[in-house]
């Protein structure tokens, strides 16, 4: 079994990761860590997240400097479900040994260090680790992931958006001079577990935020290879992302070309499902899937694509497991999709 630990295990994403690794046929969940200052330190994970009660009885161990320096050679896999700054500070130590590090923060997703000052609010000083890091969009960068020591797991909005747009861009269907327009709504769990007025039950209302300045915009643009207009919204539901994307296509594009682009991109990727109707969040919440559907207006030359994911799974934890599967030579869906043969 492959020895695995999770740092930042008390949050929503960390708990989902623990659940997935606990049930995985090849990875073994050896330890769960939280900040030494965490109010959940020394509690059992199942006591913090009731749906795991009686399933995962591991304690949430306070992370000390001694433990931090030992993990790189004690573990085979380290998942970081930590704030950006913590991942940034700890990465050189955690990646210094045999362990492969899968970082679910945004600290190593982009190569331009200035982006972190502009969008994340901190100066990036880990140039060597940043150079090493590979972007973990599992259904697109599998070959890079297979040999990487540091994998930067994509953000939730970029996962939903890129899954819809990359087939079109790679097939050359998007018209030059026109920016794809992404409108996406996320559940409140995307804001994390920490209490805040803006995500409290009585305060949440459907609202745009981070308009023309959200940190996921440069991430989407960088890995799509073209600029986009991205507007995120906070919805009054727990989890899931629904992105509706409008794209101007080239004059000669027909429905067959669009269908071929998506089929070619995802024919061997069972995590991504091309639907025959508009996706809804109920179809993907609690699953590792990304559901896609589209409609083309040939007269106006516009294509509308909808992408639906669970922000905590395909947008975070299950995609991290996909990346770990690929890194250790397994099918990306191992432990995530249970195929039943008749």
Swiss-Prot record:
Active site (record annotation): 156
UniProt keyword annotations, A-Z: Amino-acid biosynthesis, Arginine biosynthesis, Cytoplasm, NADP, Oxidoreductase
GO MF term set: N-acetyl-gamma-glutamyl-phosphate reductase activity; NAD binding; NADP+ binding
BP GO annotations: L-arginine biosynthetic process
Intracellular or extracellular location(s): Cytoplasm
GO cellular component: a single term: cytoplasm
Pathway membership, UniProt: Amino-acid biosynthesis; L-arginine biosynthesis; N(2)-acetyl-L-ornithine from L-glutamate: step 3/4
Catalytic activity: N-acetyl-L-glutamate 5-semialdehyde + phosphate + NADP(+) = N-acetyl-L-glutamyl 5-phosphate + NADPH + H(+)
Keyword Cytoplasm on entry: yes
EC numbers on record: 1.2.1.38
Domain of life of the organism encoding this protein: Bacteria
Enzyme class: oxidoreductase
Similarity comment: family membership: Belongs to the NAGSA dehydrogenase family. Type 1 subfamily.
Summary of the function given for this chain in its UniProt record: Catalyzes the NADPH-dependent reduction of N-acetyl-5-glutamyl phosphate to yield N-acetyl-L-glutamate 5-semialdehyde.
Protein name listed in UniProt: N-acetyl-gamma-glutamyl-phosphate reductase
Recorded name of the encoding gene: argC
